[in-house]
Amino acid sequence: MDKKKGILLVALGTPRSCEADDVRDYLKEFLGDPLVIQKPRWLWLPILNGIILKVRPQKSAEMYKKIWTDEGSPLMIYTVAQAKQLQDMREDFDVRFAMTYGEPRIDKVIAEMKESGVEEITVLPLYPQYSLTTVEPVIQQVKKIDDKIKVIRDFHKVESYSDLLAESIREKWQANDYDKLVLSYHGIPLSYVTKKKDAYEEQCKETTRLVVSKLGLREEEYEHTYQSKFGPEKWLEPATIDRVAELPKENAKKVLICSPAFVADCLETLFELEIENKEVFVENGGETFDFVHPFNDSLDFTRVLSEVVDQNRL
């Protein structure tokens, strides 16, 4: 008799609400992870607890309020939809979802899957590119529970992923006369690449190479940037927010921006890119700033997830 199989989709996480107390709880867990902030605990924890968690939750809560919906967090809404659609598509699997930080917790969901009779679990972190700061925390949490569970490290080279990403950009790119396409990835500290040998930067660059090749873009037609810098440390560059300020002065006044590292809308896409970066672009003389949303609840993306699982189970 075949073993009962399961798929666990894992997203980063989201506060329970957009109120400051819930944002504080979320940030404490997220920023307290030594894989996310790789500083000595004796140095970092007093800064986190004594300064950041007293100031940042209220500021972040105001940002969350600008993107929160009647149904809740966009990231939660779309992650739930992705899991449901994948379950509908793959009746041969028990499909669940969890969050690295916040609820539902990875350990709790895996326990529920095992209690229901699932014997073979494949964990798919919802990040096309691997990073020590995103996928590795999932790997470590799963390893503590059951080191026999397979965790998929990345899927940026899966053809259907880059095809779908290119197609989502092509629809807008061809319909408008843009001066520049900006591919904005979530940034990480430079030291994680140079000292910790994080593969993230190279995988982001490979994603861009694949996409612009499919789109047939010349080098001068696109930019590869990094967003969401946090703290004083040097991060991967160029910074998205710096480039969107400079582009209008370089005669690129009509820009299309997308975020290939995100597969669902969240604070970084809906607030940081669509609101904050757009304001900076317009303030510096920009005219058109359009955004290609992540895949969200696209059925085509659900098919990509299904293919990723199959390719990694062979």
UniProtKB/Swiss-Prot annotation:
Fe(2+) binds at H186, E268. Gene3D superfamilies: 3.40.50.1400. CDD domains: Ferrochelatase_C, Ferrochelatase_N. The keyword Chloroplast does not apply. One of its GO terms (biological process) is heme biosynthetic process. Keywords: Cytoplasm, Heme biosynthesis, Iron, Lyase, Metal-binding, Porphyrin biosynthesis. One of its GO terms (cellular component) is cytoplasm. Pathway: Porphyrin-containing compound metabolism; protoheme biosynthesis. One of its GO terms (molecular function) is ferrochelatase activity. InterPro entries: Ferrochelatase (IPR001015), Ferrochelatase_C (IPR033644), Ferrochelatase_N (IPR033659). It is found in: Cytoplasm. Its EC number is 4.99.1.9. Its main location: cytoplasm. It catalyses: Fe-coproporphyrin III + 2 H(+) = coproporphyrin III + Fe(2+). Involved in coproporphyrin-dependent heme b biosynthesis. Catalyzes the insertion of ferrous iron into coproporphyrin III to form Fe-coproporphyrin III. PANTHER family: FERROCHELATASE, FERROCHELATASE, MITOCHONDRIAL. Belongs to the ferrochelatase family. This is Coproporphyrin III ferrochelatase. It comes from Lactococcus lactis subsp. lactis (strain IL1403). The gene is cpfC.
